[in-house]
């Protein structure tokens, strides 16, 4: 099992990042490159929880999302063709005095089979930089979307 810790500071509020994280509509891959529309299926969606299958490139994962705590979001693997039940993501948000937000993410990858075990080993060693890049790209994409929304709102006032 591999456990990866990621950190990034953003101009987004926790609510803005969570809004992007929990946007399961078309075009999700623009925010999260490892989640393509071909794999996306929303099984249930509530005010602070969702059950969603997503993935890309032959790897899929059914995740239970819980964002009932606005400073702590948990994604728990319910099923996958690669990852075991101990897998998932945890997002912790810390508001800073300067208005920015620190996002700390813990990704756990437990291989379910040989493919998962090998991928978990790769992710836990040389693959961390790939996960870091994907995480930063998602933060940047959500920042850009948020800025565009603010610009549109300012134009309509």
Model-derived features with residue positions:
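A short, structured loop/turn motif at beta-sheet edges
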Residues: 11-15, 45, 66-70, 92-102
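Hydrophobic pocket/interface hotspot
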Residues: 17-21, 65, 75, 103-105
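Beta-strand/loop substructures that line and gate deep hydrophobic ligand-binding cavities in soluble
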Residues: 78-133
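Hydrophobic ligand-binding cavity/cleft-lining segments
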Residues: 1-47
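Glycine-rich portal/gate segments that line the openings of hydrophobic small-molecule binding cavities
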Residues: 25, 29, 38-82, 137-145, ...
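Short, surface-exposed coil-to-beta transition loops
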Residues: 3-5, 58-63, 84-90
């Amino acid at each position: 099992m591999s456990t990866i810790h990621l950190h990034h500071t953003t101009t987004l509020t926790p609510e803005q990042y969570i809004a992007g994280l929990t946007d399961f509509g078309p075009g999700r891959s623009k925010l999260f490159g490892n989640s393509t529309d071909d794999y996306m299926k929303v099984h249930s969606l509530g005010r602070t929880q969702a059950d969603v299958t997503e993935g890309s490139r032959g790897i899929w994962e059914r995740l239970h999302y819980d964002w009932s705590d606005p400073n702590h979001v948990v994604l728990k693997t319910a099923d996958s063709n690669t990852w075991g039940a101990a897998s998932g993501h945890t997002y912790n948000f810390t508001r800073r005095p300067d208005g920015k937000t620190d996002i700390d993410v813990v990704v756990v990858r437990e291989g379910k089979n040989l493919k998962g075990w090998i991928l978990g080993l790769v992710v836990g060693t040389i693959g961390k930089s790939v996960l870091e890049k994907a995480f930063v790209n998602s933060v940047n994409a959500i920042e850009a979307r948020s800025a565009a929304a603010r610009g549109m709102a300012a134009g309509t006032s």
